[in-house]
Amino acid sequence: MDVIATTTTIVSDLDSRQPEIEAPIRIQPAKPISFSNGKRCHHHHLASEAVAVATYKECLKNHAAGIGGHALDGCGEFMPSPSFNSNDPASLTCAACGCHRNFHRREEDPSSLSAIVPAIEFRPHNRHQLPPPPPPHLAGIRSPDDDDSASPPPISSSYMLLALSGGRGGANTAVPMSRKRFRTKFSQYQKEKMFEFSERVGWRMPKADDVVVKEFCREIGVDKSVFKVWMHNNKISGRSGARRANGGVVVGGVGDSRQSVVPTNGSFSST
């Protein structure tokens, strides 16, 4: 009898504890954890519970859109209807104009916007990012390694443009100097010899006696191309001077009966 009574007592105790075991257990959600550079950091949402406050101003619904026009009803501010319910979108109508709240211009409250902005903490996730700036009271203190590790300040774009424009201008000024034509200077002896030879050949370069011309240029020390240019530049002045000296007759010209002959042996004679 004692055994049966004890068993009955144990069963009754289990029946009384059964509701406690079947009670649902609430599991608290874990807070988000982020790892930054090997350190565990908890996100602190400072003002996450703040709700943005917005007001709805004038109605912008175009009542003449069907006919291609533009007409407003003149409602200046959204007025909630008596059956307003934030959970029922159909009840969000204006009591003044009867339009839905979405047709009214939404205007955020600046004070509420500043309240819901969370504070941002500088937490570099790798070692390649720059460290945060020092506090204001430590800004003037510098370590001995700052001079070695500090990089030079960046060059502004205005200085770069000035440098490029200056370099471009220098290149432009140097180009005319490189293209300047070289002017050959002749001695008085060379001028007299070239003038005398040009008078004999009629101020024209003889193509048949090219050997004689080359020999003459070698004797006076002047290149053939240079002598040809000199003859071309002084042709007019040389012929006019010879015409004045001969009384209007040009040696080797059309009005002269004498013709200068340049033989192949280098001697000159007139016939």
Curated annotation (Swiss-Prot):
Putative transcription factor. Residues 125-154 are annotated as: Disordered. The keyword ATP-binding does not apply. It comes from the Eukaryota. The homeodomain differs form the typical one by having namely 4 instead of 3 extra amino acids inserted in the loop between helix 1 and helix 2. One of its GO terms (molecular function) is transcription cis-regulatory region binding. A zinc finger (ZF-HD dimerization-type) spans 56-107. Mostly expressed in flowers and inflorescence. NCBIfam families: homeo_ZF_HD, ZF_HD_prot_N. It is found in: Nucleus. The modification Phosphoserine is found at S16. The record marks M231 as: Required for DNA-binding. InterPro entries: Homeodomain-like_sf (IPR009057), Homeodomain_ZF_HD (IPR006455), ZF_HD_homeobox_Cys/His_dimer (IPR006456). The lineage of its organism: Eukaryota, Viridiplantae, Streptophyta, Embryophyta, Tracheophyta. Homo- and heterodimer with other ZFHD proteins. Interacts with MIF1, MIF2 and MIF3; these interactions prevent nuclear localization and DNA-binding to inhibit transcription regulation activity. Binds to ZHD1, ZHD2, ZHD4, ZHD10 and ZHD11. Interacts with HIPP30. The gene is ZHD8. GO terms for cellular component: nucleus. Keywords: DNA-binding, Homeobox, Metal-binding, Nucleus, Phosphoprotein, Transcription, Transcription regulation, Zinc, Zinc-finger. One of its GO terms (biological process) is glucosinolate metabolic process. PANTHER family: ZINC-FINGER HOMEODOMAIN PROTEIN 2 (PTHR31948), ZINC-FINGER HOMEODOMAIN PROTEIN 8 (PTHR31948:SF58). Residues 179-242 bind DNA. It holds the Pfam family ZF-HD_dimer. Its main location: nucleus. This is Zinc-finger homeodomain protein 8.
